[in-house]
């Protein structure tokens, strides 16, 4: 064995040279790895005794991608494009031996080899689009040559990995080998190539799968228009694959290179890379280190089988944790379980679950009408109506029933966890776990730390979030926590704007164009205008109250802020317009022209300001945690990085200037937070905190 450098070595097995990369944890393509591979290939290529080469990685995976710590820094070592050219032009057959994940630059390197073999569990993909860029070392040019244009479009523009078996079907992998015998099988595969004098299959020279039909690209764009809305990178990926079809290989490579260089310096890629790291940061809690012991959660109890309770329960059942679900009435229990079953059956219809899986999952539920059934649960989550008195009563009863050491969690979206915890003799075991609706789909989990919540309870809740595929963000106790507290700012301004001169569809249009999935009024119509409304307490003082009194309660009644046709397609409503105009006149408001810019600033800047207050009060650990809440819980566009990142992008001095201008015009709702003032005075942004 010859060590090329500290992370790459070269060994001979008969006439086959084996290059091994050993750079834990994931063999990322650092400068050392790239340079080592280039030197090893050149050395083996020049050795007359060597007839074929295998590239293989030690540890748990093949090269898992670029080394993102090198992003944005001056380049060192041999560039990946050059390493790939050395591999492809090697006069001896080069075989990539793949296990674990061959992603991004790792797959691009494998595409530059003449042959690829993989173990059955391997995954291969080009996820660069998720970081707001395109593959930059030949991925967009070589992949369509191997798998065809249609499959390449999906793999590259969606950024989703494919399994080894699928990769073999599509021609990306030449052989699927033994799970436990990769190295030996790859060497045997290479030796067989030598024995048969097999040709050097250079991917760059293959054109048999490059169909140039423009209709394929047009159809792909049309089908995915909604999915790609607002994002720059997917369109850039499509254009690079078009280049693979219309340009000679080297020109296509140059086009790809120019594209990645352009995207790398754009705000979208900056935002998407920021989110990638921010999500990992969110799991780190300064006073709850990774070494904090966690409690074993073998069984979960859920109180409430409604929309929230059922959705929450599915998360645990999906990962094999049995759930006892409790309701007060049998019909509520039956209804809840039948909704869950229907959800699973729909997933099965789409081919993502077998009917046997559906039965296995349903078999993990134990329904009950008695809270005492929760006595053996390790975690109990209360998902009852959002009312403090009801929640206090439930926790008082739980205190007497739950076993010692059980975690007692509330799924409240606004209420004070400390007051709820005070109903028990064990406030250290109480925590907030605020799921977002639909709870089996939305990725966010706000974990609410009470004044007395124990550290191992926090560590357990954050770990569980990961287990059930959620992004856990730790927040402090305050009305609405992080997400809903900031949302209230936007909602207040949206409501004021429609009386001052805008219409609901103006506000919705501006926020939709900004990149949000829907505006506040379309959202209210979808959720139901009568949530939290009652005829007894209605004063008829807001458009929403008047709409509810008229039984215009949103999509479910065919009309709310908007009118809906039989397909639930919304259109501007003259009824709503008249309600707003009459109410404004009654309140003595002189309506005026409101610009799109004002709508955006008044809806977004107060949220940024509220985020600053949340940081000031220590209710969130870092600005990026607030951004992760908004991206995963409220559909904030990833390519804008979150409200706090957006504030930094606009420039906090500009945000402050506009807030002060609005404060002069509209009063205290726009008073800037002390933190915002301080950061501007120091010439800093939230990123510097």
What function would you assign to each model-found segment?
Residues 1-23, 48-54, 230, 371-377:
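Short beta-strand/loop segment at the start of cytosolic alpha/beta domains
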Residues 14-22, 32-74, 85-99, 119-123, ...:
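A structural preference for short, pocket-lining loop segments at secondary-structure junctions
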